[in-house]
UniProtKB/Swiss-Prot annotation:
One of its GO terms (cellular component) is cytoplasm. Folate-binding protein involved in regulating the level of ATP-DnaA and in the modification of some tRNAs. It is probably a key factor in regulatory networks that act via tRNA modification, such as initiation of chromosomal replication. Its main location: cytoplasm. GO terms for molecular function: folic acid binding. Belongs to the tRNA-modifying YgfZ family. The keyword Cytoplasm applies. One of its GO terms (biological process) is iron-sulfur cluster assembly. This is tRNA-modifying protein YgfZ. The keyword Hydrolase does not apply.
Length: 326
């Protein structure tokens, strides 16, 4: 099993992040290969993968029959199959569910621990990578392949890159950027995903939410025109009958502790506090600010005040870098 690890440090907000190499050990890789790969994955996820090019990656969801997400997947093509990235805590259970009908198809579904995941973000990340790779991804070509590496481009919260690569390439990059780049662990990438409004589904929240409750429709992760997939009826009903009353929100402020995924929050109601929502992810930045990603009612007032349960500090809503208007 290939593995990289960098010493932890408090993450920084994207606006003041120095050039940083990030070991994505809290994320994991999986693959589907075989002649039926596209047909099989098309029947299991919310996006229309038949429309995907080799230069695209997208966030999609793998749901149960009730339309609740086992996980969300960062999906892209590789040769005749597909690769996806998801939180390590959900991979085993998600793959078990995905394999349930695979006996009837010519596919092989497997975890991939031979490669490693590296984030490159912060000040002049593109320039740093341009010294190593001949071609870099961008908004037009979001996926680029270079030797043993596949590079994925992300726009939000600021330009950053995710490398699916081998340990030798990571060691080479670390050596080449020694003295220029800081090193950090998964918490830094988590902070950037929270800022970007990209839903983080860990084991505590697997099987809890329909995709729209995590804004996946605003991120291009749901096709309402494709054929059948597991959970489609419930996902479609949420859209066409207005059944979804929840959305993903970004909160920032202070707290005396970092809450866990699956915890609720408290909403201020006059002089009282009422429990609300479910936390998907939270992290504390190097300036002491707490970032929280939570699923809550989609009709909240933007001036609403929240807190971690029983805490003396407060949290406020921060705008996401995309619109929920359809």
């Amino acid at each position: 099993m290939a593995f990289i690890s960098f010493p932890p440090r408090h993450p920084s907000a994207s606006a003041r992040l120095p050039l940083t190499l990030i070991a994505l050990d809290d994320w994991a890789l999986a693959t589907i290969t075989g002649v039926d790969s596209e047909k099989y994955i098309q029947g299991q996820v919310t996006a229309d993968v038949s429309q995907m090019t080799e230069q695209q990656h997208l966030l999609t969801a793998h749901c149960d029959a009730k339309g609740k997400m086992w996980s969300n997947l960062r999906l892209f093509r590789e040769r005749e199959g597909f690769v996806w990235i998801e939180r390590r805590s959900v991979r085993e259970a998600q793959l078990t569910e995905l394999k349930k009908y695979a006996v009837f198809s010519k596919v092989v579904i497997a975890p991939d621990d031979d490669r490693v995941l590296l984030g490159v973000a912060g000040f002049q990340a593109r320039a740093a990578l341009a010294n190593v790779f001949s071609d870099l991804p961008n908004s037009e070509n979001q996926v680029v392949r270079d030797g043993a590496s596949t590079l994925l481009w992300f726009e939000h919260p600021a330009e950053r890159f995710l490398l699916v690569t081998d340990v030798a390439t990571v060691n080479m990059l670390t050596e080449k950027l020694h003295g220029e780049a800081e090193l950090n662990n998964s918490q830094q990438w988590l902070a950037l995903d929270i800022e970007a409004g990209i839903p983080v589904i860990d084991a505590a929240n697997s099987g809890q939410f329909i995709p729209q409750a995590t804004n996946l429709q605003a991120l291009g992760g749901i096709s309402f025109k494709k054929g059948c997939y597991t959970g489609q009826e419930m996902v479609a009903r949420a859209k066409f009958r207005g059944a979804n009353k929840r959305a993903l929100w970004l909160l920032a402020g202070k707290a005396s502790r970092v809450p866990e995924a699956g915890e609720d929050l408290e909403l201020q109601m006059g002089e009282n506090w009422r429990r609300t929502g479910a936390i998907l992810a939270a992290t504390q930045l190097d300036d002491g600010q707490l970032l929280v990603q939570a699923v809550m009612n989609n009709d909240l007032e933007t001036e609403s005040v929240f807190r971690v349960r029983d805490d003396v500090n407060t949290l406020h809503i921060i705008p996401l870098p995309y619109s929920l208007e359809e």
